[in-house]
Amino acid sequence: MSNITIYHNPHCGTSRNTLEMIRNSGIEPTVILYLETPPSRDELLKLIADMGISVRALLRKNVEPYEELGLAEDKFTDDQLIDFMLQHPILINRPIVVTPLGTKLCRPSEVVLDILPDAQKAAFTKEDGEKVVDDSGKRLK
């Protein structure tokens, strides 16, 4: 069992790139397909606290439930926002990665490099062609 967990959406390029950077460090993480298996309320609250971000900062804005529920309005409490995320997991921004070095919302995907315990084993180029790690495993940006 890995000591690294990624809350992953395989339909998201940022999430796929993040997962591949974890694997490029020689680690096979625990992959939680959070749209199929959403975190519990307690798990979600812990992730938010561990990331040191606000509940609203974890909200995904470019999805239907955000518009339909009127979440752009600043009238909802954190508890209400959590309820919406639990009812509509697509509202949870991703990928979230948990390692022994910290928990981060990995947007952009190379943020994961800040919390991986092991160095990159090889060059890494994101799906869009952007080179992030050179041939020696050194971060480029």
From Swiss-Prot:
GO terms for MF: arsenate reductase (glutaredoxin) activity
GO biological process: response to arsenic-containing substance
Catalytic activity reported: [glutaredoxin]-dithiol + arsenate + glutathione + H(+) = glutathionyl-S-S-[glutaredoxin] + arsenite + H2O
Active site: C12
Function recorded in the entry: Involved in resistance to arsenate. Catalyzes the reduction of arsenate [As(V)] to arsenite [As(III)].
Record-stated family: Belongs to the ArsC family.
Protein name, per record: Arsenate reductase
Organism: Escherichia coli
